[in-house]
């Protein structure tokens, strides 16, 4: 059967979410960005009114204000955007059960066979677009094709509020004349290397010698050559927590730090989040890894093997040991991260029971007791919010 794949891409998602609760910004240049006093002072998303002034994602605020002095800046609210994303995915699930979320603001839908229910693909895309707008007040663009790559490319051709079909038979006319930089999967470095090989358009890439591309670019060369020819056999795969290979948290710091005590407090908070996520998915891992990036943008990663766990204390303990061994006070730290991986398979399908969590028994294992305490903490946080409970070291630090 001929496959029909949609890529639904939410237009200017973060700032569009903000416009649903700040209608006063509609029609005015506006963007979501961090505090200009620290490193988060970059544009995360700008609306189309701001883009007319040349405002782009990742642009620093002081440059943006020169281009568009009257731009309205709204600080990011990622919890709000995650909720809106969840609502969008809920609407999409009414049209097909086969959905692959590609990011917070886009997803592939396998619509193969759905014509009998919803009609032709273009009309179905119109229904989805109107449904999202009427229910959530958000706009999207939709790409339609026979595979994921071409659907993704099609979704980028008309923004905002565009519906574009791009079938393989049409790529010579619609896709090949475009510059290689437009192609999904090609970043600045790859584009530069392609131009050094005199490859400027997607068509030139499609017709270039595949073996030479592989020689110069490795696996990437083979992949982008295939994509340029409209070939992508990958299925639309709904994600499951069982697919998770690693759970990690990192933070780019507002200011560089040089003292290890501050780093320990940050690592505790990150470990807390990793442990909470691991317990949510009932994932016990036996590999802890830390990532340290310095102000000069050099970075190191270290990992160690531990007894499988999802407990914060054990994740943090392994992280601290590696942090202390590798701390260099002469190199200011810009980013810290910690992750848990190497998950065992046998306990993935077990349910964490609230009754088991809270039952009073005679167990003497300190690990088991900590397990129960942390699971109880998770349930409290779920009800009252993440910040309701903090470790003593975090509270002490915040008071200083």
From Swiss-Prot:
Family: Belongs to the DNA polymerase type-Y family.
EC number(s) given by UniProt: 2.7.7.7
Subcellular localization: Cytoplasm
Coiled-coil regions, chain positions: none
Cofactor note: Binds 2 magnesium ions per subunit.
GO molecular function: damaged DNA binding; DNA-directed DNA polymerase activity; magnesium ion binding
GO CC annotations, alphabetized: cytosol
Subunit structure: Monomer.
Entry protein name: DNA polymerase IV
Record's function text: Poorly processive, error-prone DNA polymerase involved in untargeted mutagenesis. Copies undamaged DNA at stalled replication forks, which arise in vivo from mismatched or misaligned primer ends. These misaligned primers can be extended by PolIV. Exhibits no 3'-5' exonuclease (proofreading) activity. May be involved in translesional synthesis, in conjunction with the beta clamp from PolIII.
Protein keywords: Cytoplasm, DNA damage, DNA repair, DNA replication, DNA-binding, DNA-directed DNA polymerase, Magnesium, Metal-binding, Mutator protein, Nucleotidyltransferase, Transferase
UniProt key word Transferase: yes
Domain of life: Bacteria
PANTHER family in UniProt: DNA REPAIR POLYMERASE UMUC / TRANSFERASE FAMILY MEMBER, DNA REPAIR PROTEIN HOMOLOG YOBH
Record-listed Mg(2+) binding positions: 9, 105
Pfam family, one: IMS_C
